[in-house]
From Swiss-Prot:
The keyword Ubl conjugation does not apply. It holds the Pfam family BacA. This is Undecaprenyl-diphosphatase. It comes from Saccharolobus islandicus (strain Y.G.57.14 / Yellowstone #1) (Sulfolobus islandicus). The gene is uppP. Its EC number is 3.6.1.27. Belongs to the UppP family.
Amino acid sequence: MNFLVSILLGIIQGISEWLPISSKTQELIASHYLLSLDVSIAYTFGLFMEMGSIGSALIYFRQDVKRVFHDKFLLKFLVVVTALTGIVGVPLYVISDKLLQNAYNPSIPMIFLGIALIADGIYIRYSRSRTREFKNLSTKEMILIGIAQGIAALPGVSRSGMTVSTMLVLGINPEDAFHYSYLAYIPAAIGSVGTTLLFTRHHISYVVSLIGIDGIALAVISALLTGLVVIGFLLKIAKTKKVYLIDFMLGGIAVLVSMLGLIIS
């Protein structure tokens, strides 16, 4: 495999995982065209590459990871959200694998997500009562966040887009919404990789034989390093009052790209 392609795929993963766009879809499209992978194989490869993003999150949020077992509220949040993510996400992952084998078009859910992001940006821009902190979340609200994250198992649906938007709509301030959405990603992504190993081992064997361990390792490292930069950048923006601009921009991009995808297909 061309090492430049490995680096490019890693960069795509490292950027798209933390933006409110579907990293699975971006990796699916890129690996499909750059490596001529079958769509379902490309989807498996995208999930396999999440190891790089997991590494980014573990490094960036290492202090939060250390305090999980000393902070009962944070532990409860991660347990509840991860449990609901698994309950909702695992069946949807199995369904997704079938959908991708039957010409499923991920542009459709991306359009709805783009519209949701634009609406969320409008809400953030004109709301004057967004003062709640993460520690004020109720158990029911944690369940909603877990369900939202589980739905992101579907191709075309962004995990960070779903969780961040849900937390913002619940009134959580943008800085906390982005921060704890990214933290909740860690156990969910580990579970996602585990599910991939369990249900699509034959796909993974094919990907390894086609791309090679060195190519995969390079892509994972590239995703990890890119992710560290992107996480830091987005969290800095989330501290400002301009976070709604991210929603407007990415929502518009998601809608335009998805409509272009529908026209081409």
